[in-house]
């Protein structure tokens, strides 16, 4: 079930990579992004020559936030989930460090449509900026309609359970209506769409906590912090937001057939989890993944992993 991750040897420098003239500075989301094309030959075999990548920087307040995208990719691989490959990178001209994220669809024959575009048709007043109306029941209605009309490949219930499981493990609080969506094939009008890989995973892993302020945290402090984590979406329009674990539990109760696969995804040890990301802390980056940040991420992952296993 696990996916072998693409592992870089060194931090990639994109200073001489071609900037995408069509996309330029990518407008979607809160963090600055540039679209660039990988050179030929590529710096390492894990990079596909000529392919578009997103150079996604951190929020200014949290300069090492980009590491969350890279760690999340590795965690997704351990779970056996489709997450766009993410690498540590920088631009030697600007000095910016960022996550370098592989584009997850082929522009030549595919199109990506954000779920928010469809949800806005269900609720004409849907607030795309705040996303407070984003809820699972509306998502279910949309996906069921697509599936009945043969517009979507089967398996959407398992996809959502897996997404909630992944977000609960990494502590992602930002799976809003534009952070998931559909990939359509342009050349095959009658072909069903598929749900996109789990992209945009950087609002996670305690990125907003400064390591010098958590170095004395007790086990109770970690438990308290983890218990406050919530998903971005709600169960229904009238429900409040729920904690990472409780919303996943509710979805598992709704779709019991998804439980076996979801539980099997957690079949790894803490040592395997640590080993899956340990090499990142050894990369020589201008903004490194420090040992303090690395240990903090691991402690959070360990806490959440224990809570998730208790569900199965």
Regions found by a protein language model. Give the residues of each.
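C-terminal catalytic region of ATP-dependent kinase domains
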Residues: 186-312
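Non-catalytic, well-ordered alpha-helical scaffold segments
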Residues: 70, 95-98, 158, 163, ...
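Aromatic-acidic/polar surface patches that form glycan- and anion
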Residues: 25, 64-68, 158-159, 290, ...
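Conserved ATP-binding subdomain of kinase catalytic cores across diverse folds
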Residues: 4-127
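ATP-dependent phospho-/nucleotidyl transfer catalytic cores
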Residues: 104-164, 280-282
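Conserved kinase catalytic-core segment
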Residues: 64, 137-210
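A broad, structural surface signal
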Residues: 70-78, 158-166, 299-306, 310
